[in-house]
Amino acid sequence: MHRAVDPPGARSAREAFALGGLSCAGAWSSCPPHPPPRSSWLPGGRCSASVGQPPLSAPLPPSHGSSSGHPNKPYYAPGTPTPRPLHGKLESLHGCVQALLREPAQPGLWEQLGQLYESEHDSEEAVCCYHRALRYGGSFAELGPRIGRLQQAQLWNFHAGSCQHRAKVLPPLEQVWNLLHLEHKRNYGAKRGGPPVKRSAEPPVVQPMPPAALSGPSGEEGLSPGGKRRRGCSSEQAGLPPGLPLPPPPPPPPPPPPPPPPPPPPLPGLAISPPFQLTKPGLWNTLHGDAWGPERKGSAPPERQEQRHSMPHSYPYPAPAYSAHPPSHRLVPNTPLGPGPRPPGAESHGCLPATRPPGSDLRESRVQRSRMDSSVSPAASTACVPYAPSRPPGLPGTSSSSSSSSSSNNTGLRGVEPSPGIPGADHYQNPALEISPHQARLGPSAHSSRKPFLTAPAATPHLSLPPGTPSSPPPPCPRLLRPPPPPAWMKGSACRAAREDGEILGELFFGAEGPPRPPPPPLPHRDGFLGPPNPRFSVGTQDSHNPPIPPTTTSSSSSSNSHSSSPTGPVPFPPPSYLARSIDPLPRPSSPTLSPQDPPLPPLTLALPPAPPSSCHQNTSGSFRRSESPRPRVSFPKTPEVGQGPPPGPVSKAPQPVPPGVGELPARGPRLFDFPPTPLEDQFEEPAEFKILPDGLANIMKMLDESIRKEEEQQQQQEAGVAPPPPLKEPFASLQPPFPSDTAPATTTAAPTTATTTTTTTTTTTQEEEKKPPPALPPPPPLAKFPPPPQPQPPPPPPASPASLLKSLASVLEGQKYCYRGTGAAVSTRPGSVPATQYSPSPASGATAPPPTSVAPSAQGSPKPSVSSSSQFSTSGGPWAREHRAGEEPAPGPVTPAQLPPPLPLPPARSESEVLEEISRACETLVERVGRSAINPVDTADPVDSGTEPQPPPAQAKEESGGVAVAAAGPGSGKRRQKEHRRHRRACRDSVGRRPREGRAKAKAKAPKEKSRRVLGNLDLQSEEIQGREKARPDVGGVSKVKTPTAPAPPPAPAPAAQPTPPSAPVPGKKTREEAPGPPGVSRADMLKLRSLSEGPPKELKIRLIKVESGDKETFIASEVEERRLRMADLTISHCAADVMRASKNAKVKGKFRESYLSPAQSVKPKINTEEKLPREKLNPPTPSIYLESKRDAFSPVLLQFCTDPRNPITVIRGLAGSLRLNLGLFSTKTLVEASGEHTVEVRTQVQQPSDENWDLTGTRQIWPCESSRSHTTIAKYAQYQASSFQESLQEERESEDEESEEPDSTTGTSPSSAPDPKNHHIIKFGTNIDLSDAKRWKPQLQELLKLPAFMRVTSTGNMLSHVGHTILGMNTVQLYMKVPGSRTPGHQENNNFCSVNINIGPGDCEWFAVHEHYWETISAFCDRHGVDYLTGSWWPILDDLYASNIPVYRFVQRPGDLVWINAGTVHWVQATGWCNNIAWNVGPLTAYQYQLALERYEWNEVKNVKSIVPMIHVSWNVARTVKISDPDLFKMIKFCLLQSMKHCQVQRESLVRAGKKIAYQGRVKDEPAYYCNECDVEVFNILFVTSENGSRNTYLVHCEGCARRRSAGLQGVVVLEQYRTEELAQAYDAFTLAPASTSR
């Protein structure tokens, strides 16, 4: 069933609008899909493509061609006889590609390739090649214009349809690349059947694999016998909601040949723009506005579809498809498709561009303004499905891994053409060749753009693969690197709007529909495969009461949320080539019997990047924490997180280090909230704005670095015979586990104390484990800054030096900035469900020792959870706990049920002193260990380091765990922790002496104990009270040397208890207490019990580290330098955003936050003495005026200064039209009628009176009210009235002259009013508010106005109204007034006190009256006394009243060609004295006076419940982001406004979080208007309270918090949306600084 599409249409600010019309399939429509083989689709309820899909912009809809190179070129597989003319060009093409395969960095060859394709009119390929040439140093001056011309040609071709069916002469570069690469691999000489002997060349560290890798054919397709064909997903697959379990893949094909050489890196600009991929046959890419056509849905036989279903993807990355080719058949509305595939039912429907009745607030405004880019036809831009579809709860595995994994690209997409035997390359003929529409829809913005808060998981691949499915993707053809899309698209601006509103709200309002679906059948426990998945709580959009769904949902949801984290965040990139190459060649599982008949392999639920499992509707802050994640970069956990292939990592036939995720896979089961490692997390330098490393922490780092250098120098001098410890970075490459994308860098930097010895451990372990069939697991994160581990087993490292130990601590501390990036983490893994040893490179992880979990479970089998399990719980309440319990799955492999500790309640957050005590104890332990190592080097080879140390008794392990295991041991751990806290405080007071450790062994037992204590305990730096004090307890009694470097060391902000905590990272080779169950990211050290942080920036904490040396011992005492807490009332603009967040976070505000946005100390109003009685002549002052004699005068800066001088309320500029040669005839009545005679005119019917009088109807007294009635007509009809009144006036004049009439003032032929009126007033009609905003209809008129000086123009950088972001009729557009004598514009101030420009077109004159803004309150009082509303009423001042009140009135005549500048806040009223036309618009010059008055009126309007037409808070933030302000007064005002706005948002947010109300992130899109409360018309900035009108699913209304709470005190039925992440506002606030005066204007 397809919900009818409502026609798009304009809306008034208060009108509701239909959201339903924006959905292609309807978020709530029941879409009976075609069930894929062996699986049943849920009945329609939730199978729409709405929630969870990222808005995909489609500036250039491609055509549905079947060639991988060109949409309209027949598809020729390698080896297929293809008609290839121009053999010379082909030879040249092959030669270039062969040379580039050897060395991609040859701009000349890339340019040559581009010229080849350009000569054959293949602009897409040419643009790609030119981009590559630029990437490798080509001349931008030469290539830039060429690229622009080609892209423009593509655009024109799309509109003209000229190249829709043009066959290409040259084969696509991708085909050639892959073909030659296959030959290259055949010559590579590697044996099939095992991992490659030799690792291919290292790619550049910072260069991720080109997006081609995303969709590159996995080895199983490109190289395996059954895979040499394009295997796309049918439309059914495309319809599979994201994250559903997949049917089991077929038996894995034989291992592929060795990996290819690294592909050329992507274009440099792609780090922040989505990777682009060529259009595939049938590919539904972001530019297809088209849903799959019915003819394409069922065209493939079921068996072929089943094959495609079962063919797993080997690559977890989405391939955002991008094509610049026009659609060959039809343009379909640009459905904002997202990570989630659309259900089959939805596939067949496109959004028809019907007209929508006027609608309101949220969605239509977004959608109407997200008409995509101008290059898209209206049909193509009709936004469909503003929200991605919610995943059906509990849907059994129904589709192939390819369809289910939103980000795993159909590897067939790239390069490997279908076998010649496959009939019909045309995608309509052979849907088997289609790429998964789902994947194809994962366009660039699918990952770069934000997703709705509750997106159905989709972007993360959940492909479950036979754990070892080997595949070796060919090097991605550079062709896949599409040129960056238009900026609007890159930002997901226009297209995001389409999907981000309705369905997400529908989800929140109406919950998930449809009967619960049973979880996928458990997979029989078999070696090398994941254990049977238990249903777990869905992280999709359904309510918390919905049935559990397969674990896949969690990871996908997390992934989708992680995408949404950054509106501007980088888009997902492929992993570095060495990771990508090693994905496939992993050992295959020992169970090749898995067939399509087997129950679906439970999809690996990959780590939730601390993204909120935002679908659970529990009222907790944790669920939407992700919306504030300060790390937009993690917006792409589309990394090797997919379990489709073994995690990428160096694997070779010869013994060599293998990433822990590879070797120890058998010990690992599917984890509920594992973190998908983000390959680019380390690949690219993190944007400075997100390096939330506080200054204090940075200082600690510096101090530690200095100490490290000193220690290294000393050690090198003292131990000349001992080699210095190897750099910590090298072991990291091999040991780095797949860590949560949010915290991957943390583990990368957080080197455990034994980092120097872990290389050996890992090597041996992984070698042994290499032979075991690992289950499909997320690969370890790429280590951008670290080379892959060395191939030969490294020799045992030398004794650890103080330098290396301090480096470890530094790493721990530095890791905090990365941990902070995981702010909204809803990272919860099933506690105790699977031991974390699979990523701990100790042999105990499956090969030589039983996998240790925690000390208690492994040694005694006791159910106590390990340390890491304690961090796996979210304290956010029931739904999370249910999710953990439901998501637990036993891990296969050596893990026995006895070893799986049951989940326990969340331990209380650690205290500040505990945290700091841990740091000091860690430093101390490090130094002690170093001392022992130097004295007794044999210790370095102790069992701990080698990873073979027997497990200590549980009690000992508990002691050694730094108190964390104890704290996590059971429900009573909270009390024990509190006791420990008190002890630590006492110890801190002592500062030197005893070690208040519960059950700690005496100093005699120190040696064995400290072996495990080297792990540094659990530096729970992310705990709730992370910023607490840290007072250490030194071991030494006598202090010989004390160094007191004081360093501000603010660890990242505390994590509220309501947030789930990321897992801790056990140190490899340590005792079992570190190897407690944890997510796959748990790998290096238990040092980091990562807790998700609150949204605000970290609190700065100054820590003084005191180094105490006594004999051979060195102790660090860490003590907090107390800082005064900042109160919210003490905040000033000098404080940074972190201070603002911290001060306002815990502020308790009673009632509504009502602080002013203006500081009273910043007024710039002129001083006007109102007490002095002015003489009569001064009550009629001369009007400031300027006569322009030349164009030079008009553009003089003096004119701007004069007009905007606060002392001049109004300025008349004479002769402007003549000096600028304005053609005012364009605005004459005759021209207007010719241009658009049927244009609407608002008519005001008035009584004609003298300009300085205003009589009542009886004509007996003057009054203030000036009433008029409103009606409408057209320009043509009013022109007739205007002309006839002029003729009648002329005739009356003649008659009056002849008869000496006593009524000389009668100038109209209409009958006089019948009311008793001695003056015999006449009725006149005033044509007003004629909108000239249509740039096409009024193009000549609007272009003529561009001749004006910049500050007077309708649009300019210095005009605040140009930064509103949307149209305000009459303010930032031109309006026309058609007048007859007596037409009155009653008294008023401009909207929000903005300036105004008015030009008299003529031929008659107008008389103006004006009063300075200073007197508006007096005039308002007059209006009140006369019973008329000052702000909204119609009044005409009595001049005598004003004079009596000592108010001077400026009075002057505006002649044709004169321009009147009405300064900010000026009260004015106008009457026409002749027949004339006027044009007018508003201007907001960036002056302090204008800004102050605008904000004053903004606040006054709120008091009077009047709508502020200009959304000043929204405008202020936009100005702060885009304009350099050099005026100090203006800068202070704007900064203060931003400060108040941040405080308001934070206070409001914290109150909602405390109340347990979810806040859903929904980023803004281009041209999205500001929102106003539907009831009180106040601007609603950032945090929107949305309700469904009358329970309707199609209409949503925005409210302010006050009105929302009046409707429902507990906000039941109200969805809270957040449009800006806290980090976005903080970044903009801090970046807004005073610019040098020289750059002013």
UniProtKB/Swiss-Prot annotation:
Comp. bias regions, Basic residues: 974-987, 1002-1014
Low complexity bias: start-end ranges: 214-223, 312-326, 396-415, 552-568, 743-766, 855-879, 1306-1317
Residues annotated as domain JmjC: 1337-1500
Catalytic activity: N(6),N(6),N(6)-trimethyl-L-lysyl(27)-[histone H3] + 2 2-oxoglutarate + 2 O2 = N(6)-methyl-L-lysyl(27)-[histone H3] + 2 formaldehyde + 2 succinate + 2 CO2
Keyword Phosphoprotein attached: yes
Pfam families in alphabetical order: JmjC, KDM6_C-hel, KDM6_GATAL
Composition bias type Basic and acidic residues, residue spans: 293-309, 361-372, 704-713, 918-931, 988-1001
Biased composition (Pro residues): 242-268, 467-488, 597-613, 645-660, 774-801, 891-908, 1047-1066
Keyword terms: Chromatin regulator, Dioxygenase, Inflammatory response, Iron, Isopeptide bond, Metal-binding, Nucleus, Oxidoreductase, Phosphoprotein, Ubl conjugation, Zinc
Sequence positions bearing Phosphoserine: S224
SMART domains cross-referenced by the UniProt entry: JmjC
Classification via Gene3D superfamilies: 1.20.58.1370, 2.10.110.20, Cupin (2.60.120.650)
Source taxon at top rank: Eukaryota
Protein name, per record: Lysine-specific demethylase 6B
Taxonomy of the source species: Eukaryota, Metazoa, Chordata, Craniata, Vertebrata
